[in-house]
Amino acid sequence: MTLAFQLAVFALIATSLILLISVPVVFASPDGWSSNKNVVFSGTSLWIGLVFLVGILNSLIS
């Protein structure tokens, strides 16, 4: 269970870093938002899901 929690936290941190870099790039590029809207929404949905997963796993561990 601890390994699953650690992997979920790592995935959350990695996803956060990827979104931290990619979202401003998408907004700054001309025509970037209209062509990459689905990718940004998918990444954001993944991030929200990982936040809930980490919270649930944290409550099971402690």
From Swiss-Prot:
PSII is composed of 1 copy each of membrane proteins PsbA, PsbB, PsbC, PsbD, PsbE, PsbF, PsbH, PsbI, PsbJ, PsbK, PsbL, PsbM, PsbT, PsbY, PsbZ, Psb30/Ycf12, at least 3 peripheral proteins of the oxygen-evolving complex and a large number of cofactors. It forms dimeric complexes. HAMAP family: PSII_PsbZ. Controls the interaction of photosystem II (PSII) cores with the light-harvesting antenna, aiding in the dissipation of excitation energy within PSII. PSII is a light-driven water plastoquinone oxidoreductase, using light energy to abstract electrons from H(2)O, generating a proton gradient subsequently used for ATP formation. It comes from Nicotiana tabacum (Common tobacco). The gene is psbZ. InterPro entries: PSII_PsbZ, PSII_PsbZ_sf. It is found in: Plastid, Chloroplast thylakoid membrane. It comes from the Eukaryota. This is Photosystem II reaction center protein Z.
